[in-house]
């Protein structure tokens, strides 16, 4: 648990430092005059310090609704994982729960969350950038970004896999799995 929290906090710090605008606020190094946006020298050895620059993050999904970028691990397999989720304004999940506890850090924007079994945007609560949250195992919730937001909500989601997600009805009872889409 402590190791996972260190991974989470370390990943969150790296992401927070790589947010747009941070480089302009960082004063140059007095010895080299380098800034985060204009580094001098070579990047760290990736065998010692693996890294992915923001421009190299691979986003998948619907750019009008929800996009996902896997940073490390795989939530369908055993072990730790870290995923960025980008909720575009007006996009929400449906009520569901996960069988494993997960930890969330809001990187940017406003992430709207509800613990209601009923899908109604009026029951969501805003978690602004910088908010940390725990998604307790087997508790119903749903989340996304409200219509009218000026930017997507980006969250860093971490946990231990494998994790199973179960959609629920308005009574909180599991729904049967959806049939695969036909081509």
Indicate where each model-derived feature is located:
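A short, N-terminal "cap"/entry segment at the start of jelly-roll beta-barrel domains
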Residues: 25-81, 170-183
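Bacterial N-terminal signal peptides
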Residues: 6-16
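Short beta-strand His + acidic residue motifs that chelate non-heme Fe in jelly-roll/DSBH
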Residues: 93-95, 113-114, 135, 140-148
